[in-house]
Amino acid sequence: MSEISAEERESGTVFAPKFDSDGLLTAVVQHVDTREVLMVAFMNADALDATRKTGIAHFFSRSRQTLWKKGGTSGNTLAVSQVLVDCDQDAVILLVEPAGPACHTGARTCFYRELDCGALQDVRT
């Protein structure tokens, strides 16, 4: 992607994602209705493109070094309602309608534990 000015990046209308040195940007995934944070993942240009084209969240697996469609195996897809872009265009929030649990453990959200006095406590309700 071509470089744009800081002013255009921060206040303009040109979408020019600022990927890190590994070609990734952070994606925070929130439930469209409750705004609960469901997960955090990474997107490369291909994942961002696939998400925009299909309306289903796609991410880049750093461990497997491959593109993956969330819910491709489990069926627990994330239908993207809106993509919010931060001021630096190096992170996005995906507002989604989940088709099931967001976490691979089966939990509704990947954030189901709280750090309390040095130990993790389950906070699922």
UniProtKB/Swiss-Prot annotation:
Zn(2+) binds at C87, C103, C110. GO terms for biological process: L-histidine biosynthetic process. Its cofactor is Mg(2+); Zn(2+). Its EC number is 3.5.4.19. Belongs to the PRA-CH family. Catalyzes the hydrolysis of the adenine ring of phosphoribosyl-AMP. This is Phosphoribosyl-AMP cyclohydrolase.
